[in-house]
């Protein structure tokens, strides 16, 4: 093997070869391999980058996994689901999970002075990871999410802003649609615009605080106690009435610690509440099992004193009363439309999905993956792998043809040398090995040159973004590139093995050369 390698190197370094016909042919073959290898490197890098960018855009809108109620059948509207903090904690603890957040969606209508547009209103909370929205923010800022005050702020797409002539800071009306007969308007201030490049997102999605959807949909119950003066002449009696909002309207009122029943109104003597620190509580339930809400009031007479009239009757008098209130915040925020789960890597999707199904998912919940939510996009991305395979096969075929032509010409030019080697006792295998090493050396130089050219072009594109695309057609405005070492090494190894194996057949020409005729060959 050492002798074959030595002779192969001398053949390629032969100074007399400068004037031989094989020199330009070998150079052409090497240039072809360089260009073909560069095309393969760029094809793999651009395809991987494109798949990564599109997956990131789709995942950013709804997460890798979504947990919803089993009643979910419309992606534009999420039924209520009880949010279990323990379940969210269990999800965060799973290997491969990067982030967990809640969300809700409702259909809506955006109205300005002269335009109207149907949208999907997406509610997000304080547990939001803002990275995705910040990355695609065009102008302004994100709405305040998760605050106790819940300001009426909205983030809309740049497409919607241009179409409806809306500017950051403008006030728009959003009609939230509960059902055909229940459409409620609400004013929102536009805080910013975004652009993802995904038509199904940019054309219809607006973002608000999830609390607006929780209360609008009346997923929970809100209890309240109405207190008023009596009209029966008893200054120490108060009229109380239970109020409730939300639920399924088949409401039940409980007044713990009292004999009161039903909504009321009821008359109450604060003295009767002394054992409860003067507090009167109301708990509201409904027949569908909605999480109940509790409200309470404490009645405190102002300047309470007792007087005795001329008949010796002792009774209390006071100058008005003070009502302290508490509770009644509602149980709406204990419901969400669903839970989104973001993973550390897309290739962990199947493993995490299996674990969530087995360990975390409740019987009344449904788990969907991003592939199931956007099957057409992922089918398209998988089709790109077929295109890559076609390009690689074509480039390898071109390399094989180039190298076969170059090797045959080198063999023909070295016919006399082949005859001499055989006359000196070299076997056909040893002579073939010389020319296979020549071919492998030329291939190696071409592959390394192609790697260098492809990587340089890819890095220039990554750093400068000089090749741009129409975002309406390709979802990205710049050709993305994702370079990793292992795909390049696989391309190199595969190309080298296939091409060298293909050179075995033309190298067999050596076996047909007779030493006596070869020595006389000119």
Report residues per predicted region:
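A short beta-strand structural signal in non-transmembrane regions
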Residues: 65, 160, 332-356
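Peri-transmembrane interface segments
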Residues: 19-27, 345-400, 410-412
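A structural signal for hydrophobic secondary-structure junctions
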Residues: 80-233, 243-265, 273, 286-290, ...
């Amino acid at each position: 093997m050492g002798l074959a390698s030595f002779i192969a190197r001398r053949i390629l370094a032969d100074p007399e070869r400068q004037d031989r016909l094989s020199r330009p042919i070998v150079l052409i073959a090497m240039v072809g391999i360089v260009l073909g290898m560069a095309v393969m490197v760029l094809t793999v890098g651009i395809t991987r980058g494109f798949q990564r960018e599109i997956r990131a855009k789709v995942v950013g809108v709804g997460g890798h996994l979504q947990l919803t109620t089993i009643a979910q059948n419309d992606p534009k509207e999420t039924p209520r689901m009880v949010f279990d903090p323990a379940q969210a904690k269990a999800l965060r603890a799973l290997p491969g999970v990067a982030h967990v957040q809640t969300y809700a969606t409702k259909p809506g209508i955006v109205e300005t002075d002269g335009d109207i547009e149907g949208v999907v209103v997406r509610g997000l909370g304080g547990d939001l990871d803002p990275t995705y929205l910040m990355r695609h923010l065009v102008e302004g800022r994100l709405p305040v999410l998760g605050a106790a005050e819940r300001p009426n702020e909205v983030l809309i797409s740049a497409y919607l802003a241009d179409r409806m002539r809306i500017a950051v800071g403008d006030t728009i009306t959003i009609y939230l649609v509960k059902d055909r007969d229940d459409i409620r308007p609400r004013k929102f201030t536009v805080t910013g615009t975004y652009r993802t490049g995904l038509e199904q997102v940019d054309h219809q999605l607006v973002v608000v605080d999830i609390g607006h959807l929780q209360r609008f949909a009346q997923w929970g119950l809100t209890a309240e106690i109405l207190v008023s003066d009596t009209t029966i002449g008893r200054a120490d009696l108060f009229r109380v009435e239970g109020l409730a909002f939300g639920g399924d309207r088949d409401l039940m009122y409980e007044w713990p610690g009292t004999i009161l029943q039903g909504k009321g109104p009821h008359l109450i003597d604060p003295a009767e509440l002394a054992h409860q620190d003067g507090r009167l509580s109301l708990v509201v339930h409904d027949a569908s099992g909605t999480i109940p809400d509790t409200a309470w009031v404490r009645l405190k007479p102002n300047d309470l004193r007792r007087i005795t009239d001329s008949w010796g009757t002792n009774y209390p008098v006071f100058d008005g009363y003070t009502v302290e209130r508490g509770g009644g915040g509602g149980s709406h925020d204990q419901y969400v439309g669903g839970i989104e789960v973001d993973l550390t890597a897309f290739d962990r999707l199947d493993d995490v999905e299996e674990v969530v199904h087995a360990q975390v998912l409740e019987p009344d919940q449904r788990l969907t993956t991003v592939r199931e939510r956007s099957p057409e996009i992922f089918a398209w991305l998988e089709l790109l792998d077929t295109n890559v395979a076609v390009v690689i096969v074509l480039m390898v075929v071109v390399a094989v043809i180039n190298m076969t032509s170059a090797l045959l010409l080198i063999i023909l030019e070295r016919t006399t040398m082949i005859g001499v080697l055989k006359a000196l006792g070299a076997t056909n295998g040893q002579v073939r090995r010389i020319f296979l090493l020549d071919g492998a050396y030329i291939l190696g130089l071409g592959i390394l040159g192609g790697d260098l050219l492809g990587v340089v072009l890819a890095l220039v594109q990554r750093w400068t973004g000089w090749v741009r695309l129409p975002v309406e057609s390709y979802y990205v405005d710049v050709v993305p590139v994702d370079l990793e070492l292992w795909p390049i090494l696989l391309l190199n190894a595969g190309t080298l093995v296939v091409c060298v194996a293909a050179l075995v057949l033309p190298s067999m020409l050596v076996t047909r050369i007779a030493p006596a005729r070869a020595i006389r060959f000119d």
